[in-house]
Amino acid sequence: MTINEDAKKKIALLSQGLPHYTHLLSLYAFQRAASTDRSHVEIGDVRTAIDTALAKTQQSIISTYHRATNSPRENLYSQVLLSCALAQPDSLGYFSAVDVRKPLTILMNKPYEIPAFSQHLNAFCEFSRGPVLQRTGTARRFRFRFENPLMQPYVVMDGIRKGLINDDLKSSKS
């Protein structure tokens, strides 16, 4: 079997260097191609693989994501968490609130300042919303990273599935 270069790049981008998601997305994309009697994987097969991978994700990831984003009221928790997943991390996987601002502004199609979502970041570090993020540093200089490295790609793929971002990890509203 062979794979389209764009499909290969998409799998690498979505898996964010984690073998777990690289293998999972590849497996489901190749299975999709084989199930339709093709020996070549296309980008559409990867899109289908995203849905399958999300449906078969570890229950602990799904439960933590649900706890982090679920609320009876209208809120920004899922958008802020997606923005965290899209934020540019440092070499250790940490990002700051400043790094979250740009993806959130693009995602919501309006400017957001740090005070508008800083309580969300702090909540993600507490048991009531996860904890989905780890926090290090001191006040006004906090750095965050995902508690479980498998959560970040899951959040991105869920954003694609929900139509919040496109396959190129850009806002679907732009």
Stretch-by-stretch model annotation:
Residues 9-12, 105:
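Amphipathic alpha-helical segments within well-ordered protein domains
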Residues 1-7, 14-20, 25:
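Conserved small helical "lid"/interfacial subdomain of P-loop NTPases
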Residues 134-143:
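Short, Lys/Arg-rich nucleic-acid/phosphate-binding segment
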Residues 23-109:
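Winged-helix-like regulatory helical subdomains adjacent to P-loop NTPase cores
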Residues 107-129:
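Short amphipathic alpha-helical interaction segments
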Residues 6, 10, 24, 79, ...:
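Amphipathic alpha-helical interaction segments
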Residues 57-62, 142, 147-174:
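Short, amphipathic alpha-helical interaction segments positioned at domain boundaries
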Residues 2, 91-92, 109-112, 134:
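Short acidic, glycine/proline-enriched loop segments that cap or flank alpha-helices
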